[in-house]
Amino acid sequence: MSGSYPSPKGIHPFLLLALVVGGAVQASKIVGGHEARPHSRPYVASLQLSRFPGSHFCGGTLIHPRFVLTAAHCLQDISWQLVTVVLGAHDLLSSEPEQQKFTISQVFQNNYNPEENLNDVLLLQLNRTASLGKEVAVASLPQQDQTLSQGTQCLAMGWGRLGTQAPTPRVLQELNVTVVTFLCREHNVCTLVPRRAAGICFGDSGGPLICNGILHGVDSFVIRECASLQFPDFFARVSMYVDWIQNVLRGAEP
């Protein structure tokens, strides 16, 4: 894998690889965040088991009226034919009139490597076109290979647990995070919350990282434990996949 990872100052790339492969935990919750204003993040999707309404297991982002971007590992062990995609949600246990529910007609992967947590992105084609408006809207994509500088402020969000032993929240949570470049890889955007234990964790994989109003990351994994203060949180870098995404979207047009 030489050449695949940048070498952060003072960190050998093979040490970073060992940490990622040996200590990665796929992300699923927002630790230390707060409740989002209802329906203020209209691009956020909830992936649920069709037989169990409200059974959120991963997040996603609407990037086109017929497509949701999520993490590839979300459907590694679950058939996409058993999944319902919910848009326009805030309270997952409430029958909100804003909610729109879809099945999946097709999935598109891009060389996902689960051993090294690379290319952790997956496109879900919905069975019909979403009705766009105030509560359901499409997120903006970055330019191909667009980068984020150290210190960029972003927003992570999801319905994952509020702590390791805490229950799963009913309502959407969000957290202000800061982009960091140490202990990161070119395939990822990495973030920390300075000076406090907060971040992503078990249960909200696939959810968005929004920076300057643009979708820059897909919630992917953490190293060793959640909100450790030692390692950043890892998101799949959306800007690496924009050309691939656009090719999929063009190919799906009638």
UniProtKB/Swiss-Prot annotation:
It comes from Mus musculus. This is Myeloblastin. May form dimers. Interacts with CD177; the interaction tethers PRTN3 to the cell surface; the interaction is direct. Interacts with SERPINB1. Interacts with ADGRG3. It catalyses: Hydrolysis of proteins, including elastin, by preferential cleavage: -Ala-|-Xaa- > -Val-|-Xaa-. It is a peripheral membrane protein. The keyword Membrane applies. It is found in: Lysosome; Secreted; Cell membrane; Membrane raft. One of its GO terms (cellular component) is extracellular region. Gene3D superfamilies: Trypsin-like serine proteases. Its EC number is 3.4.21.76. Serine protease that degrades elastin, fibronectin, laminin, vitronectin, and collagen types I, III, and IV (in vitro). By cleaving and activating receptor F2RL1/PAR-2, enhances endothelial cell barrier function and thus vascular integrity during neutrophil transendothelial migration. May play a role in neutrophil transendothelial migration, probably when associated with CD177. Triggers inflammatory processes in neutrophils by interacting with ADGRG3 upstream of F2RL1/PAR2 activation. One of its GO terms (biological process) is collagen catabolic process. Keywords: Cell membrane, Collagen degradation, Disulfide bond, Glycoprotein, Hydrolase, Lysosome, Membrane, Protease, Secreted, Serine protease, Signal, Zymogen. The active site is at H73 (charge relay system), D120 (charge relay system), S205 (charge relay system). The keyword Transferase does not apply. Residues 1-27 form the signal peptide. The gene is Prtn3. GO terms for molecular function: serine-type endopeptidase activity. Disulfide bonds join C58-C74, C154-C211, C184-C190, C201-C226. Residues 28-29, 251-254 form a propeptide.
